[in-house]
């Protein structure tokens, strides 16, 4: 992909601008399954190999202890995210095409790569109205897949699309609809089979099907799931869950609807049949849809913006950075960021870059809204700042 795939260009035409509006939304990353394989009696407190945490906490680094017989220790599980994107980004059609722009240089042949990706796509097409078809690289497609080195596409010039980090770090990232980009780190050792540590090669062998299925979920509009056994869980590779769970189905159906055979279940649920006609709903409505299920999104205490909110009218495509009072941070306060009262916990490449005391976004119609930073020390609010962003066409 050429430059500008993630960040709108001021010189783009009207058609490109509409496409780039969706392209600016971020990729989510999947990290390696650093499964602990310690021998009996081996201490479990050795330092792990470098694990990049590109969309979460600061990076950790270290080297394997000289006396250790186990591979790198697993990263500490991190906090969970919403299941759907903030703007509920989705595809407007179900017959999606994909093309493979480059293949891995380690271990897998092109034919094996195609077979692994096709298996990952089948995991989603078997439980959804989507169908996926590969097309030639020179043809237009909805999804574009590639195996890339550290410096790929526009990662060096884009503040919101990060580069890869080499082996045993970030495995892949995918962009929300309608961008369609799915990038795999070509420094990894991809295989068809379970993720495992190779003592002979001294590297991790990573299951392509597992990682690809996770990234396809992001490309369809799903974020990380809260369910511990979901394929879309933040640490799915670490935990080893490979099958799609009911949680992914509910997330997918919230975005695209669930096509029940009689096309009546949704209206029955609205009429109260979940309480008054439970047997009827159970007998005629697909259990995978579960129209009576209320998805348990995480909730946080509402944080209204301060009385004085700065309004900024920004040209479309401009990079906007908010800074949350450096002086107040010296009082050992912790910064919390919100958009329209929803918490922002992680950076999303191509969407926003989140630092301790600053937040950067690309101005576009979807990123319009009110951004608030709250500095707290324990339960006490030390300071608040708020900005309202409006895009000038």
From Swiss-Prot:
Keyword Hydrolase among UniProt keywords: yes
Domain of life: Eukaryota
Glycosylation sites: 95, 151, 235, 319
GO cellular component, one term: extracellular space
EC number: 3.4.24.-
Stored Pfam families: Peptidase_M10, ShK
Disulfide linkage: 258-292, 265-285, 274-289, 324-373
Cell compartment(s), UniProt: Membrane; Endoplasmic reticulum membrane
Family stated for the protein in its record: Belongs to the peptidase M10A family.
Function in brief: Protease. May regulate the surface expression of some potassium channels by retaining them in the endoplasmic reticulum.
Amino-acid positions noted as binding Zn(2+) in the UniProt annotation, renumbered to this chain: 214, 218, 224
Active site residues according to the UniProt entry: 215
Family matches, as InterPro entries: Ig-like_dom (IPR007110), Ig-like_dom_sf (IPR036179), Ig-like_fold (IPR013783), M10A_MMP (IPR033739), MetalloPept_cat_dom_sf (IPR024079), Pept_M10_metallopeptidase (IPR001818), Pept_M10A (IPR021190), Peptidase_Metallo (IPR006026)
The record's note on its domains: The ShKT domain associates with, and blocks several potassium channels in the nanomolar to low micromolar range. The relative affinity is Kv1.6 > Kv1.3 > Kv1.1 = Kv3.2 > Kv1.4.
Domain Ig-like C2-type: 298-383
PTM entry text: N-glycosylated.
Keyword DNA-binding listed: no
Site (Cleavage): 81-82
Membrane topology category: Single-pass type II membrane protein
Cofactor or coenzyme needed: Zn(2+)
Principal place of residence: membrane
Lumenal compartment segments: 42-393
Protein name: Matrix metalloproteinase-23
UniProtKB keywords: Cleavage on pair of basic residues, Disulfide bond, Endoplasmic reticulum, Glycoprotein, Hydrolase, Immunoglobulin domain, Membrane, Metal-binding, Metalloprotease, Protease, Signal-anchor, Transmembrane, Transmembrane helix, Zinc, Zymogen
Top-level EC class as recorded in UniProt: hydrolase
């Amino acid at each position: 992909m050429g430059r500008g795939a993630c960040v709108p260009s001021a010189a783009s035409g009207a058609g490109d601008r509409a496409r780039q509006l969706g392209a600016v939304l971020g990729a989510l990353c999947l990290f390696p399954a650093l499964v602990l394989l310690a021998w009996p009696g081996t201490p479990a407190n050795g330092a792990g190999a470098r694990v990049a945490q590109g969309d979460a906490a600061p990076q950790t680094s270290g080297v394997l202890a000289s006396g250790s017989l186990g591979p790198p220790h697993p990263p500490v599980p991190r906090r969970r995210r919403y299941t759907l994107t903030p703007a509920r980004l989705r595809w407007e059609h179900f017959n999606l095409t994909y093309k493979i722009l480059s293949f891995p240089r380690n271990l897998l042949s092109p034919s094996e790569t195609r077979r692994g990706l096709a298996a990952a796509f089948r995991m989603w097409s078997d439980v959804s109205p989507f169908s996926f078809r590969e097309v030639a690289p020179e043809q237009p497609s909805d999804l574009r897949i590639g195996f890339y080195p550290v410096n790929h596409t526009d990662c060096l010039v884009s503040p919101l699309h990060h580069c890869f980090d080499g082996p045993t770090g970030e495995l892949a990232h995918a962009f929300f609809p309608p961008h369609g980009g799915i990038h795999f780190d070509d420094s990894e050792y991809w295989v068809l089979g379970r993720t495992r540590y190779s003592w002979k090669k001294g590297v991790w062998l990573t299951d392509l099907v597992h990682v690809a299925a996770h990234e396809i979920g992001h490309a369809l509009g799903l974020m990380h799931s809260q369910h511990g056994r979901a394929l879309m869980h933040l640490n799915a590779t670490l935990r080893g869950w490979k099958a799609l769970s009911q949680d992914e189905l509910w997330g997918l159906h919230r975005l695209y609807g669930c096509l029940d055979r009689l096309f009546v279940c949704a209206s029955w649920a609205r009429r109260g049949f979940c309480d008054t006609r439970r047997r009827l709903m159970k007998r005629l409505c697909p259990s995978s849809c579960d129209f009576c299920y209320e998805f348990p999104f995480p909730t946080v205490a509402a944080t209204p913006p301060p009385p004085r909110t700065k309004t900024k009218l920004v040209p479309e495509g401009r990079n906007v950075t908010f800074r949350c009072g450096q002086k107040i941070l010296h009082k050992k306060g912790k910064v919390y960021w919100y958009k329209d009262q929803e918490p922002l916990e992680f950076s999303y490449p191509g969407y926003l870059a989140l630092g301790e005391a600053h937040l950067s976004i690309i101005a576009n119609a979807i990123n319009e809204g009110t951004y608030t930073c709250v500095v707290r020390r324990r339960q006490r609010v030390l300071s608040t700042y708020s900005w309202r962003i409006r895009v000038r066409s």
